Structures are given as C-alpha cells and as structure tokens.
C-alpha cells in the first residue's frame, strides 16, 4: 500500500512539474512575458492572496528584488528537485515550535493544503504564482523571525546594540537554487550558547508536558521539612527525577512504587534544594508556600518562559570575542566572562537592581525606578566616588527628611554644591540654598566614605540613563532572595573582584592596589586599557548543560512581550 501511495505522489509531482513548464515556459516568448507581467502585478499589490492583512512595504520590496533575480519567473519550481525542496520548507514550518516560534505565523496548514491541491489538479498560472510567492514570503518571515525576532526590541523598551543587517534576498535566492533551505535556516539561528541550551530545554519541557493529562499538583497538608512523612513524596521524587533527567525525552513515572520510603529525605531533598537555588529561593529543602508554588507551576508556563527568553536572545548580536559582563535583572545576578564562551564564567555574583512593580506602590513611579535594559562599554572606574544625587531623589526623599530634621544633611555626609565637579566648594544649608536645590540652581552630593550610597567604587559605562554598577554599604540586602531595592543602578556583591576583572589589562593593578584605592582619602579615576562590553538584560529563563533556571517576571516584561507576539500573529492570519 505504501509503495502505491509513494508512486501516486511521484506521478502527481511529475504531472505538476510538466504543467508548470507548460504554463510558465522559459525563454523570451509570449508565455514568458505573460508570467513576468503576472508576477509583477502580484508583487505590486498591497496584500497577498493567501493572507488577510497587507504585508509590509519592506516585505513587498524584498520579494520584488528576489523575483527580479529570477527574471520574475517561478522560483520554487525552477530547481532540480522542487517537490523535495518545498516539502523541506513545509517541514521546517511544522517544526517551528521547536524554535519557540508559531507554525501558523508561516501559514503552515494553508500551504500544506494548497500544496496537496496543486498536486491533484491542473492549477492556473495565477495559482502557481500565488503558491510560489507565498512560499517565498513565509520563508522570508521565518528567517527574519529566527534571526532577528518577531517583535522589535525597542517596542519592548530594550535598547540594545543592533544586529548587523542581513541580505535576505541573495541568501534566500541561493538557498532555493541550491536546494538548501534547511541549511540556511540553521545558519540564521542565533549561535549564542544560551540560545542553543534553551532550545534543548524547550524540547525536553515540551516532551514532559505532552505526557500530562493535567498539570502536576502537590497539596501537602503542612509545611514539609526534611525528615517529615507524606504520601506524595513518591510522586514528588518521580517528578523531580524527570525534570533533572539529562535525557531530552524523559518519562514522568505515574505508577508510584508502594514500597517507596515516603519519608522526605535523601536525594529528593537535594533535588528540592537545587530547585530552590535555581529560583533564587533559600535552598533549605523546606517545602513552604513559595516552593509549593514553584512545584505547582504548570509546565506550559515554563515552556512560555523559555520561548520568550529565546525571542529576546534573538535580539542580541554575536557576543564579543574578548571579556564581557552580563547582568540578568530577574536573576539578580552578574556574570563576567573571559571570552564569548558563555559556559566558562570568570565571576558570578549577586546584584541588587531597580525596584519592581510590587515594590512601587505609587503607580507613576512603577517604571521610573526599574533598571533599564541596554548595552554599553565599561570605560573607567571611579574609586572613592561622590554620589551626585538625582533631582528626583533629592526632592522626593531627602529634602522632606531635612525639613523634619535640619541635621539630616550633615549627619549623612551630604553637601550642597554649585556643580558636581570634584573641586566644587560645599555651601551652607541656608533656607535660600535649600530653595535653590528645589529649583535645580544648586545640587546635592554625598561625600566619599562609609556612608556613601555608592560604596568605595563605581563602574562607569556612559549611557543615556545615568546607570552604572557600584559598591554599596548595605551589604545585608544581598542575603535576600528578591533583590530589587535600588533606584535603577546596579549594586554588586563583590566590587573588588569585579574591579580586578575590569583592570585585567591595566598594568600593576593587583588586589592590594585596588584595596588601597578603595580606601584611600581622595577620589580617583582609572581609565580601562580595554573597554569591557556590558549587557544589562532581562530573561526569566536561562539554561546550562545541567539544568534550566527560571526567574520571576519582576517588571512584567514577559506579559508585555507575550501580548505583543500574540497581536503580531493576528496580523499574519491566512485566509
């Protein structure tokens, strides 16, 4: 039966190719001119016959350039093995979810249906061209989505270094002519280690989720501590075994061994501790409210987090070959790398970031205190820095305290100055000068010292947001699991280690010299011999070769991106 079906498909394909050549002959003749005119007319229209909404001007211009390379003839039917090439493309669309993409965005079912119809009929020239150009349009969209992402990063307030422009016209044309569409798609994937690891994790989590008829749910009668007993320990162990399995196709055991020791101890406690550490919780193995919420989070939610994180990684250019620094806001962590091989980090430390929605009770301040997402280059360090206080903090927080306590400024090493120069002379806190602080004619800064909010050092990468990395006297806050306490700048847990990393190419800067500079009497500025790229990023899922870590969506960016992707997909609906 299979041989008969295959033979029939081959006959249909041969019939289709002969029919295509009859309708669209090559060479300078009337038939060829008719094909050219029909193609040009189709590509000059505002919308494509297969899609409800108009395509963009950029898409139309790209398609026009693509078909001009082929003298406005059929592209996909002009190769040696068109059937295999078209099937390869449709299979690529079917597998789009494994890339964190949506198959319907590329009209997968519509094209698959039309492909069957074409092979079982005598299509018109218009039908051939509509199908051919639909393949090209969706391939362009797929490659663009895979390489650059579906939503512009600036639309989501991600201000990142733009990626290098890609000549999609020549690449698509070459891929079709050489029948290598799959290879081109592979080449368009981000090469970032983080992306590839998330892609692997996505496959695993999809496999796990497919096994469940309903989400896994645990309902312990009380807080479960190591050594406690519960009938759900076996179920918990099976679930965590599947999550921690190195296999890409792990199985969730549902038939719990009645002989299992239902005492919460041993390896299952270790796995819970690892889970807590991955989610920035205290890794004590105690299953309380927060840990229970983690365990009961549907796998579909984790899949969405992975997909959204992959989307954001598509926005990033290739990482620099030399050292670079990454801050992931939801993870409250900083990593410093010697090279662009992300799996080999040189430093890994806690950070404190700008306040989240939950931390901001005032609706108007919800976004103003968040740490922005952008990239830059650390170019110099400031030891024993002054803190030049932003006007918003001055008027909203400090001056109201001064009005209640006239000694507040002096007790906190705060001084009024005409400008922020190191040589500026402090002015008295007279009523007249206080009024000039309100009107921005004078400024307030904090002197270097143990009370200084920036600690003993700050790491400067000039930007439009006045954001930098810095030390802090408030080291107790690093013991918290959720560390969103700043006004936007990023406080680092181990500033001396980060300084040693940053000054690696500056001759003579040893640990001892850094310590001396941090505790000297006067401020000093040190320019880096080699600027270090820094990326302030936002990803609620990160994967390594051993496990996936998920983080809370503290700024609600996942929700915003998910909405933008859904709205964008509505604009790509096929008839």
Residue ranges and their predicted role:
Residues 4-17:
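Bacterial N-terminal signal peptides that target proteins for export
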Residues 15-17, 143, 298, 303:
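Intrinsically disordered low-complexity regions specifically enriched for long asparagine
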Residues 25-27:
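N-terminal signal peptide c-region/cleavage motif recognized by signal peptidases
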Residues 29-61, 160, 182, 186-575:
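Well-ordered beta-sheet/strand-loop patches within structured domains
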Residues 31-164:
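Cationic-aromatic interfacial patches
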Residues 140-204:
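Histidine-centered catalytic/metal-binding microenvironments
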């Amino acid at each position: 039966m299979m041989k008969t079906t295959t033979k029939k498909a081959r006959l249909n394909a041969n019939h289709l190719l002969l029919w295509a050549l009859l309708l669209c002959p090559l060479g300078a003749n009337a038939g060829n001119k008719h094909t050219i005119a029909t193609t040009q007319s189709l590509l000059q229209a505002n919308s494509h016959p297969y899609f409800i909404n108009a395509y963009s001007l950029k898409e139309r211009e790209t398609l026009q350039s693509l078909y001009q390379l082929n003298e406005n003839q059929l592209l996909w039917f002009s190769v040696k093995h068109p059937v295999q090439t078209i099937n390869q493309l449709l299979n690529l669309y079917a597998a789009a979810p494994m890339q964190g993409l949506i198959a319907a965005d590329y009209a997968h079912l519509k094209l698959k249906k039309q492909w069957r119809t074409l092979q079982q009929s005598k299509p018109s020239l218009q039908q051939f061209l509509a199908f051919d150009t639909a393949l090209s349009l969706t391939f362009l969209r797929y490659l663009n989505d895979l390489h650059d992402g579906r939503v512009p990063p600036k639309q989501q307030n991600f201000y990142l270094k733009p990626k290098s422009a890609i000549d999609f016209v020549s690449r698509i044309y070459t891929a079709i002519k050489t029948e290598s569409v799959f290879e081109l798609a592979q080449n368009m994937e981000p090469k970032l280690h983080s992306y590839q690891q998330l892609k692997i994790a996505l496959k695993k989590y999809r496999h796990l989720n497919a096994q469940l008829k309903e989400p896994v749910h645990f309902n312990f009668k009380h807080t479960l501590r190591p050594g406690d007993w519960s009938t759900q320990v076996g179920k918990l162990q099976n679930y965590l075994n599947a999550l921690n399995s190195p296999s890409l196709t792990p199985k969730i055991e549902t038939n719990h061994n009645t002989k299992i020791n239902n005492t919460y101890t041993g390896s299952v406690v270790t796995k819970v501790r690892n889970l807590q550490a991955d989610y920035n919780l205290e890794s004590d193995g105690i299953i309380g409210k927060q840990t229970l919420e983690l365990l009961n989070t549907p796998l579909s939610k984790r899949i969405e987090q992975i997909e959204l994180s992959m989307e954001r990684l598509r926005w990033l250019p290739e990482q620099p070959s030399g050292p670079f620094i990454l801050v992931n806001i939801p993870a409250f962590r900083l990593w410093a790398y010697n090279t662009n091989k992300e799996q080999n980090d040189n430093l890994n430390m806690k950070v404190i970031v700008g306040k989240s929605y939950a931390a901001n009770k005032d609706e108007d301040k919800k976004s103003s205190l968040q740490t922005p997402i952008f990239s830059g280059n650390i170019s110099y360090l400031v030891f024993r820095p002054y803190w030049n206080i932003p006007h918003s903090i001055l008027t909203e927080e400090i001056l109201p305290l001064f009005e209640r306590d006239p000694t507040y400024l002096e007790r906190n090493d705060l001084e009024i100055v005409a400008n922020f120069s190191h040589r500026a002379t402090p002015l008295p806190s007279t009523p007249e000068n206080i009024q000039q602080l309100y009107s921005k004619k004078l400024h307030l800064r904090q002197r270097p010292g143990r009370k200084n909010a920036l600690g003993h050092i700050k790491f400067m990468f000039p930007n439009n947001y006045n954001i930098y990395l810095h030390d802090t006297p408030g080291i107790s806050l690093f013991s918290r699991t959720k560390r969103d306490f700043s006004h936007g700048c990023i406080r680092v847990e181990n500033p001396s280690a980060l300084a040693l990393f940053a000054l690696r190419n500056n001759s003579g800067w040893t640990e001892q010299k850094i310590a001396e500079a941090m505790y000297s009497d006067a401020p000093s500025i040190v320019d880096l011999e080699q600027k270090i790229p820094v990326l302030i990023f936002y990803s609620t899922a990160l994967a390594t070769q051993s496990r996936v870590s998920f983080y809370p969506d503290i700024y609600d960016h996942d929700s915003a991106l998910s909405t933008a992707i859904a709205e964008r997909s509505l604009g790509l609906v096929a008839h």
